[in-house]
UniProtKB/Swiss-Prot annotation:
Name of this protein: R2-like ligand binding oxidase
GO BP terms: deoxyribonucleotide biosynthetic process
Family (UniProt): Belongs to the ribonucleoside diphosphate reductase small chain family. R2-like ligand binding oxidase subfamily.
Protein EC: 1.-.-.-
Pfam families per the UniProt record, alphabetical: Ribonuc_red_sm
Family annotation (Gene3D superfamilies): Ribonucleotide Reductase, subunit A
Binding site for Mn(2+): E68, E101, H104
């Protein structure tokens, strides 16, 4: 391959108003270092939990850290696909995206080390078949497919798995579980800070995935069917993951969590993505590039979570 030009020095320069570069600037402005999070109190809170509670929390953390490792490893083909399209802004953002995923892997490992969990945890995720299907089969297959087929349809399929199911349903539901555990009891302040920081990063990641699907749907309406079909295939698997995880604990789910609440939460986060993607149908591509609707959707989800957790705090305070 011979390089023939540089996008950064062409006439007009870069479009800093485009969504990918807005996300890039946002990530720079909100940089954080895992080493700055204080996990010192978490160890004492951890030891005060029951054995059953510690097992549940360890499983939840194992699912997160393995998932963060998986997405760190699997994102590279998307960068190559953006390069093939000549989209420097997206490439720039995805370098930051990959760095943040690696940082998330780091910080979950630091937390496990801080609370003294150093055992092999593979068995905890292997007991959840839907987790294995998504993270060991669907995710790597969809992203690896981009190495030989970086077409818009292949990109949409990859984004569905990565951005809309793994991040947009499973990760959000997991963060919500951590918040419910920590906020309800007033425990694990380091984990609370960790989840807050990661959640902020992930909102940008999900917004990029939504943007990518929207621009492909706007360019070719056939890609709407690709999105819709693959989401409808994977949403049941994502919901099954939640069901399988809770089923391991029978009628005595630790921390007083309720399966129905989390199934509703996960389903809601998945289904509301359809409208944001479909709203791009028939739109001019130039409009999509500077339309911040994807980021606004994630901010709406974050605001809703904040209100729900404020209500949990109020209820806990009233009970005491």
């Amino acid at each position: 391959m011979t390089r023939t030009h540089f996008d950064s020095i062409r006439a007009g320069g870069l479009n800093w108003s485009s969504l990918p570069l807005k996300l890039f600037a946002g990530g720079n402005a909100k940089f954080w270092d895992p080493a700055d999070i204080d996990f010192s109190r978490d160890r004492a809170d951890w030891e005060a939990l029951t054995e059953r509670e510690r097992e549940y929390a360890t499983r939840l953390c194992a699912e997160f850290i393995a998932g963060e490792e998986a997405v760190t490893k699997d994102i590279q083909p998307f960068m190559s696909a953006m390069r093939a399209e000549g989209r420097l802004g997206d490439e720039m953002y995805l370098t930051q995206f990959a760095f943040e995923e690696a940082k998330h892997t780091q910080v979950f490992r630091m937390w496990l080390d801080a609370v003294g969990v150093t055992d092999d945890l593979h068995s905890l995720i292997e007991e959840v078949p839907a987790y294995v299907q998504i993270f060991c089969e669907e995710l790597p297959a969809a992203l690896e497919a981009l190495t030989s087929d970086p077409s818009p349809a292949a990109q949409v399929r990859a984004s569905v798995v990565y951005n809309h199911v793994v991040e947009g349903m499973l990760a959000l539901t997991g963060y919500y579980a951590w918040h419910r555990i920590c906020v309800d009891r007033g425990i694990l302040p380091g984990m609370q800070e960790l989840v807050r920081r990661i959640g902020d990063d992930e909102r940008r990641h999900m917004a990029w995935g939504t943007f990518t699907c929207r621009r492909h749907v706007a360019a070719d309406d056939a890609n709407w069917a690709v999105f819709e079909t693959h989401m409808n295939e994977l949403i049941p698997v994502a919901l099954r993951l939640t069901q399988e995880g809770f089923a391991l604990y029978g009628d005595d789910i630790p921390f007083g969590l309720e399966e129905g609440e989390f199934l509703q939460y996960s389903s809601d986060r998945g289904m509301r993505r359809f409208g944001t993607i479909s709203s791009a149908r028939g739109r001019p591509l130039a409009e999509i590039d500077v339309d911040y609707t994807p980021l606004q959707l994630e901010d709406t989800f974050a605001d809703e979570d904040e209100r729900a957790l404020t209500a949990v705090k109020a209820a806990a305070a009233a009970a005491n």
